[in-house]
From Swiss-Prot:
Keyword Ribosomal protein on entry: yes
Quaternary organization: Part of the 50S ribosomal subunit.
Keywords: Ribonucleoprotein, Ribosomal protein
Underlying gene: rpmE2
Record-stated family: Belongs to the bacterial ribosomal protein bL31 family. Type B subfamily.
Protein name: Large ribosomal subunit protein bL31B
UniProt GO molecular function: structural constituent of ribosome
Record-linked Pfam families: Ribosomal_L31
A cellular component term, taken from the record's GO annotations: ribosome
The keyword Acetylation is assigned to this record: no
UniProt xrefs under InterPro entries: Ribosomal_bL28/bL31-like_sf, Ribosomal_bL31, Ribosomal_bL31_B, Ribosomal_bL31_sf
């Protein structure tokens, strides 16, 4: 393999932001934050959903906040988002 062209494959902590669950796995993800876990410092990747919070795995239905996404879409596209196409 060529030197210097492959991303850094390392242990990373992924933290589920909905319930605080953390797990360590190997990844090439680029992160800006670090976290100390078990006396060792790891890069931290924050995620919205994991197997600990996803309704498929937990068996509990959870309503996700989509209102913010809809408002952001409407602000971005304005009148075009009304569903009426100009002829």
């Amino acid at each position: 393999m060529k030197e210097g062209i492959h991303p850094n494959y390392r242990e990373v902590v992924f933290q589920d932001m909905s319930n605080g669950f953390k797990f360590i796995t190997r990844s090439t993800i680029q992160t800006r934050e670090n976290i100390e876990l078990d006396g060792k410092t790891y890069p931290l990747a924050k995620i919205e959903v994991s197997s600990e919070s996803h309704s498929f795995y937990t068996g509990q239905q959870k309503i996700m906040d989509t209102a913010g996404r809809v408002e952001k879409f409407k602000n971005k596209f304005g009148a075009r988002a009304s569903g009426k196409l100009a002829k």
